[in-house]
A protein has these predicted regions:
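Exposed beta-strand-loop-beta-strand "reactive/processing" segments of non-cytosolic proteins
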Residues: 1-2
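Pepsin/retropepsin-fold aspartyl endopeptidases
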Residues: 7-15, 19, 23-26, 34-459
Length: 459
């Protein structure tokens, strides 16, 4: 039988009723479970051993039941609402909200906060798309945290192994979050692509525990007690939809089509990613300029198609000329799914002050002054990466000014518009993305050679 893009096949013994084998196929990914060691408990047959295999060794698991009780009843106290003291989040004493905390919007998209993790001052990236809090391996080592076990983390670039640590406490904006379990992943590759290290990613836990008031236009954030929160501002309400593993989705419309379901992801730097099945259905890549870009997050780098959508409508607000990414290949990552039609990122969210109220299953959107401003787009075609103290070309977009000028992957860049290349190189490319077509920019190679690019819109 099938439901929600998942096909389930169950093998049942016609004589005993035992189900010793089942197969789940979700979004093309297969999981097989074998059951054995059947025993009868109060007249009911149970498998005391379950062995599951997936597509990688990390997905394998074995569950052994030591005790099974049948029809014993449950204490009503188990269903009581958790007390406030049980929350993993503690606001400042006597307060229902934190003060405003300044946000460093890296590349005007990624939400960087300053705080502490287990007493160590650090940058913290806020990411509603993260299934749990994540520590970079280098920080986990600095904190002396012991990694135990391994799970498989699924990101936009594919799947990667993640260690698990416990006892992680985060402090920011005068509040305390934790102790939490956290995943430990080598985030150096993601940081290189983003143009800034990601020592800590604070995930969905904070969104479930509090109302998050993220004022993108004002570059500030605060956190409010969810139980006492009441919205009385000028914004529009947008309903949230439960998604896999505690994430949230919402509906928006693309180019006048029927509203479709997309994931809510503050950690995605683009405006909108459109998943392959929906892009094919609507023919979005036909009849318009299309190029490619190198991107990706946890799991590695991926190459995506890029094009400009005529319009995207969210909560009744219509946005024009929206740059979008389209998945070109199936990497078994978070975006390779038919349960959603796309993923909404910071490129659109940053046009608003957004209040995330997961407890009431809604967002409140207040448009900023630049709601109708043209969207920034890459106009050079160069994807750069910072590694080993140098800036290098990692990708050249087809049909872009860089491609026409003969740029090659691996070339090293020493300066951008006369500014020596540093780990903060992303700020210069952000400026270029906002510049008008026809603007001339200069790049100096490691050997001192200077090259000129004339920026243009190529998709």
């Amino acid at each position: 039988f099938e439901f929600n893009c998942t096909a389930i096949e169950v093998q049942v013994d016609p004589e005993t009723g035992e189900s010793a084998w089942s197969r789940w196929v979700a979004d093309g990914r297969t999981r097989v479970t074998k059951r054995s060691d059947f025993r009868t408990v109060n007249g009911v047959r149970f498998a005391f051993l379950e062995e599951t295999e997936g597509e990688t060794a990390r997905q394998a698991q074995t569950v052994t039941w030591e005790n099974v009780t049948v029809n014993a009843g449950l204490d009503d106290a188990r269903f009581a609402r958790p007390s406030a003291s049980a929350s993993v989040v503690r606001l400042p004493a006597g307060r229902k909200a934190t003060d405003w905390l300044a946000v460093d919007l890296h590349q005007k998209r990624y939400v960087y906060l300053r705080g502490e993790v287990n007493g160590v001052a650090t940058d913290i990236v806020l990411d509603s798309g993260a299934g749990m809090t994540v520590l970079d391996g280098a920080l986990a080592k600095e904190l002396g945290l012991r990694v135990e076990g391994e799970l498989e983390a699924r990101g936009t670039g594919g799947n990667v192994g993640a260690g698990i640590v416990s006892g992680v406490t985060v402090k920011l904006a005068g509040m305390e979050v934790g102790p939490l379990p956290a995943a430990v992943i080598d985030l150096s590759g993601v940081g290189r692509r983003v143009g800034r290290p990601l020592p800590v990613i604070l995930g969905k836990e904070i969104f479930h525990a509090l109302v998050v008031d993220l004022d993108y236009p004002g570059s500030r954030i605060r956190f409010l007690d969810a139980a006492s929160f009441r919205y009385d501002g000028p914004g529009r309400k947008l309903d949230l939809i439960p998604a896999e593993d505690g994430h949230k989705s919402l509906r928006l419309a693309i180019e006048g089509g029927e509203p479709v379901v997309v994931g809510l992801d503050t950690g995605q730097g683009g405006a909108l990613s459109v998943f392959r099945h929906y892009a094919d259905e609507r023919g979005f890549l036909s009849g318009r300029p299309v190029s490619e870009r190198r991107g990706g997050g946890v799991g590695g780098a991926t190459t995506m198609k890029v094009a400009t959508l005529r319009s995207v409508t969210i909560a009744g607000y219509e946005l024009k000329g929206v740059p979008a990414a389209f998945q070109a290949t199936d990497v078994r990552g978070a975006f390779d799914t038919k349960r959603q039609e796309g993923n909404l990122g910071a490129g659109i969210l940053s046009r608003f002050r957004v209040l995330f109220d997961y407890g009431r299953a809604c967002l409140w959107l207040e448009p900023g002054a630049d709601l109708g401003a043209p969207f920034p787009k890459d106009k050079s075609g160069l994807v750069l990466g910072w590694a080993d103290g140098a800036l290098a070309v990692e990708f050249v977009a087809p049909g872009s000014p860089a491609a026409e000028a003969g740029w090659k992957e691996g070339e090293r860049v020493a300066a951008l518009d006369g500014e020596p290349a540093t780990a903060e190189w992303g700020r210069v490319l952000t400026r270029w993305s906002e510049a008008k077509a026809g603007t001339t920019v200069r790049l100096t190679l490691a050997d001192g050679t200077e090259r000129v690019l004339v920026l243009k819109e190529y998709y």
